[in-house]
Amino acid sequence: MIIGYARKSTHLQDVTHQVDELTKAGCEQIYHEQISRGGSKRAKNGAPELENCLKALREGDTLVVWALDRLGGSLSQVITLLDDLKKRGITFIAIKDRIDTSAPVIGEIYTHLMAIFSNFERNRNIERTRSGLAAARARGRVGGRKPSLSEDDINEMKILLADPEMTVGAVAKRFNVSRMTIYRYTTKGNHSEKINDE
């Protein structure tokens, strides 16, 4: 039996294209699901339809996906899954990545697999970053690092630097920041002070 699995991991994705390609590949049954960010674990609560799909597969069956990254999870989970399929006598096909473990030269296929693993992990990281930034923007956060000094810290720093005996290095050490950070806060806007750089 040829079984397909389609997955979308963001609200911007649609499984229609994946399902169409799986149907063209001869899939008799297709499992598909939406994976929410944060559900990166393949089994248990992360991808129940993938789990159902894997349970349905029998020796001699074929699992078809549009692309390797549709299996989700981490790179190590994908490698483990592919190894498990091989041990169970199940053929694996990833249409977009041109992977077909039924091909006669298995060694070449695994070499090809290893070549695309790095691209797979890079794409997963990009997707996670974009999803995280979109979620942060939705909560009103625009990203970037939190300021290293509060308004109270800046005021105290300016008072300390007004003392001619106080050095930038000493103030930086007191606030656990770099000297460059001290310069940045003392030269912002129209405010510029002569400070002791010793």
From Swiss-Prot:
The active site is at S9. GO terms for molecular function: DNA binding; DNA strand exchange activity. It holds the Pfam family HTH_7. Belongs to the site-specific recombinase resolvase family. Residues 168-187 bind DNA. Residues 1-140 form the Resolvase/invertase-type recombinase catalytic domain. This is Protein uvp1. GO terms for biological process: DNA integration; DNA repair. InterPro entries: Homeodomain-like_sf, Recombinase_CS, Resolv_N, Resolvase-like_N_sf, Resolvase_HTH_dom, SSR_resolvase. The lineage of its organism: Bacteria, Pseudomonadati, Pseudomonadota, Gammaproteobacteria, Enterobacterales. Cooperates with the mucAB genes in the DNA repair process. Could be a resolvase-invertase protein. Keywords: DNA damage, DNA integration, DNA invertase, DNA recombination, DNA repair, DNA-binding, Plasmid. It comes from Escherichia coli.
